[in-house]
Amino acid sequence: MIWHVQNENFILDSTRIFMKAFHLLLFDGSFIFPECILIFGLILLLMIDSTSDQKDIPWLYFISSTSLVMSITALLFRWREEPMISFSGNFQTNNFNEIFQFLILLCSTLCIPLSVEYIECTEMAITEFLLFVLTATLGGMFLCGANDLITIFVAPECFSLCSYLLSGYTKKDVRSNEATMKYLLMGGASSSILVHGFSWLYGSSGGEIELQEIVNGLINTQMYNSPGISIALIFITVGIGFKLSLAPSHQWTPDVYEGSPTPVVAFLSVTSKVAASASATRIFDIPFYFSSNEWHLLLEILAILSMILGNLIAITQTSMKRMLAYSSIGQIGYVIIGIIVGDSNGGYASMITYMLFYISMNLGTFACIVLFGLRTGTDNIRDYAGLYTKDPFLALSLALCLLSLGGLPPLAGFFGKLHLFWCGWQAGLYFLVSIGLLTSVVSIYYYLKIIKLLMTGRKQEITPHVRNYRGSPLRSNNSIELSMIVCVIASTILGISMNPIIAIAQDTLF
């Protein structure tokens, strides 16, 4: 008798939960239509994989890419609509969130063709790889639109769990296993620190979890200048600093970059920074509105450390992926300038513009590294010597992307940094901008050092890897070259036509 009562209660509770979920999707589902497209793509992937054979592998790539393109299209149709809050205040749709979601989808769309040949050569499991990439993309999109502390914590964990699995995807590689372990342990620690900061914010605001309601709660409780808010700020900054690879929370980055499969590194190097930047902007600007001087100072210190350490240590690296890891630490220091400047002086617009340029520059560089690695089996910078004599197209593409990362005119990286630094200078961040300019000069040195190696024609400097260089026999290499060409063109010409991009970025609102 007792068992029957408990069973009936369980069925009733389950029915209520299901009906509530159905009600939310029915009335609020239109607000997450781009995300629903990705979810449908994930289900379709699993269905095809469970009912098909090896001949249907191209369909898996097609479904993944089509889902991402359709999601981008849905986002573009929703552009300029009125800001809306849905799912009982958990999710917000506005232009600011959507432009970051667009950047994440763009990253994933370019990363899938970049991965095709690598997966075939290394015989990695295709369905699981695409599943993790799409799920991580979904987590990043939900993070961009998150409007409460719970969603801001759960969404990046969805992204992080997929990132841990992707970084250790080549299970037989010892370096990949080491990278996964370090990433998992430090990621878990940073998440604990982040949620501890959220608990202080929750308690200080009188039990509020929505970002705007936290501000109102702090006013009502008169806790906006309390020590609890300072403690929350420190813990949250440390947690977000890990996600952004800000110094001194950057130690995991070089090892994960070096040990993970190269297409995975390409994916993580841009999507994680885009999603974390969107989240950081809203967290610092809304709940910590009354502590703007404190978080400005804190972020300035971290940005200076990142720019100096990242670019100086990058000079000493012998691995291309480790060099790009330290370079990315320096690059995120430049992005922080836009977050500190804020919306009043065009800081957010300059940050978004530079993020778009960084995606093209970074993914273009990684596409070149994937191609070179598949054809030579090496990642050592020294082994790139003389590549121009064997593959001029690949060498020139890599050189253009590196020059753009360094910020040399007339490439996109130059105009992106120029606008970012100019906004910082107008906002009075003279010391921070000066450090940014000096470290940019340092970065040009190690990029030019690689380009000099690429173009060398002296036989004694050319290593056996380039001497025995061969083109890939696989027909799928066109997909990598397609991603590479798109990124190289974007890295070259986007800067010239950046005024429309800035105008679109300035149209973003919270």
Swiss-Prot record:
Chief location: plastid
E.C. number: 7.1.1.-
A GO-annotated cellular component: chloroplast thylakoid membrane
Location(s) in or outside the cell: Plastid, Chloroplast thylakoid membrane
Keyword set, alphabetical order: Chloroplast, Membrane, NAD, NADP, Plastid, Plastoquinone, Quinone, Thylakoid, Translocase, Transmembrane, Transmembrane helix, Transport
InterPro entries in alphabetical order: NADH-Q_OxRdtase_suN/2 (IPR010096), ND/Mrp_TM (IPR001750), Ndh2_N (IPR045693)
Subunit structure: NDH is composed of at least 16 different subunits, 5 of which are encoded in the nucleus.
UniProt-recorded name of the protein: NAD(P)H-quinone oxidoreductase subunit 2 A, chloroplastic
Species of provenance: Citrus sinensis
